[in-house]
Amino acid sequence: MKIAIGCDHIVTDTKMEVSQHLKSQGHEVIDVGTYDFTRTHYPIYGKKVGEKVASGEADLGVCICGTGVGISNAANKVPGVRTALVRDMTSALYSKEELNANVVSFGGKVAGELFIFDIVDAFIEAEYKPTEENKKLIAKINHLEAHNNDQADPHFFDEFLEKWNKGEYHD
């Protein structure tokens, strides 16, 4: 399976461990960054993971930031993406089996690597169980999406990166 993975600078080490774990399980990993500990902004990588999944280049996605909240919100803004921020096995399985989630997100400072490995493995193995009710619910959720042409611009976040580089944001 092809899995896109992305993170911000706070949890690059965790992302690298998850990536290695996925590769050891036989998955092809599409690493969209970040690749080091240089300050960056999590929405960039949530968007990149979401785009890989929405385009079909990746089957599923994994997003990691400090808490998981910011990066999951960014990924969820990509049309066609259903991201689940999970902190337990039940939520991970429910999101995939009932809501057909295609991206799973974590807080790398909240959950340990081995726990993340277990949840990612379960999420990948879980299968969507379509019912008339959940298909209608997913259709309603998908209807909420509005495509924004500005999102296709690769420089969409540049103004925030400039502020970040000037030290205007803090961890």
From Swiss-Prot:
Pathway: Carbohydrate metabolism; D-galactose 6-phosphate degradation; D-tagatose 6-phosphate from D-galactose 6-phosphate: step 1/1. SUPFAM superfamilies: Ribose/Galactose isomerase RpiB/AlsB. Its EC number is 5.3.1.26. Transmembrane segments: none annotated. Keywords: Isomerase, Lactose metabolism. InterPro entries: LacB, RpiB_LacA_LacB, RpiB_LacA_LacB_sf. GO terms for biological process: D-allose catabolic process; galactose catabolic process; lactose catabolic process via tagatose-6-phosphate; pentose-phosphate shunt, non-oxidative branch. It is an enzyme of class 5 (isomerase). GO terms for molecular function: galactose-6-phosphate isomerase activity; ribose-5-phosphate isomerase activity. It catalyses: aldehydo-D-galactose 6-phosphate = keto-D-tagatose 6-phosphate. PANTHER family: DNA DAMAGE-REPAIR_TOLERATION PROTEIN DRT102, RIBOSE-5-PHOSPHATE ISOMERASE B. Belongs to the LacAB/RpiB family. HAMAP family: LacB. Heteromultimeric protein consisting of LacA and LacB. This is Galactose-6-phosphate isomerase subunit LacB. It comes from Staphylococcus epidermidis (strain ATCC 35984 / DSM 28319 / BCRC 17069 / CCUG 31568 / BM 3577 / RP62A).
